[in-house]
């Protein structure tokens, strides 16, 4: 990045990225050979192994469809924003998504590391433990997602005002839609991990329908309401497929239990997030008088105060009213004591 910045030649940056990619692959392969000498790959054995494990190709094809649909969902919005507004609006929109996407990626990378553990847990077949860990992971995702959207709702506009200027701030409705989509993307992780753990990829109609709904709704609504209409596409499609269908699919084919308990606990999470949001807003508006858009120091102070107030209230409410966050807390305390 420093080379690209000072030389203004991105070919250098691409060359370095490519070279380090090859170097990393070589070092990684050598480390794998040292750590797992029994794990060897041979292209010549490919056809034989495919015959022995036919499910591998079947699952790969199904997973490929899911990944393509996810790509369509995540990459089409900027083009549609440009189609129904202007290049200037795309730049403004990109400023927001640059912040939300990077933070979402960081959170998902941290929480996504539990995926392999979920697969092992499912393989063990302990139904009670499977459900307990499911709600632990779900509760921590909703807790973190609540902090994420609350913080960005109050902090992203003053930050952009400091960073670029107040004329780069977009309508509040656009911010709400961006955060709603980000919230779904963060909270969907546990369902996806368990679907992968059970090997449930055969609902290939779902990602195709999700992509089709996203494009059609974004195009239709975008022609009427511009950027807000475009953002309605992923919001509606993810609500129908990710929030409604995928839990039904997991509970029916994976857990093989009633879905009513899921909706009941989930409604409790939403009620807690809403209550924590209202209480936090009332508290910090009554005690905070600083303007976060006046300087970076005041913005950092404002961010620490508002985020801390919400985090404390949200954790207390979730700890009191949900079993998942209590189990997760006990697990973390045990690990720390060890």
Positions of predicted regions on the chain:
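Interfacial/gating helices of multi-pass transporter permease domains
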Residues: 10-15, 51-59, 79-101, 129-132, ...
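Short runs within selected transmembrane alpha-helices of multi-pass transporters and secretion channels
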Residues: 1, 13-29, 66, 70, ...
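Alpha-helical transmembrane segments of multi-pass membrane transport and lipid-handling proteins
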Residues: 131-185, 215-224, 273-278, 282
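Interhelical loop/hinge segments that connect adjacent transmembrane helices in multipass membrane
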Residues: 10-13, 28-74, 117-132, 249-267
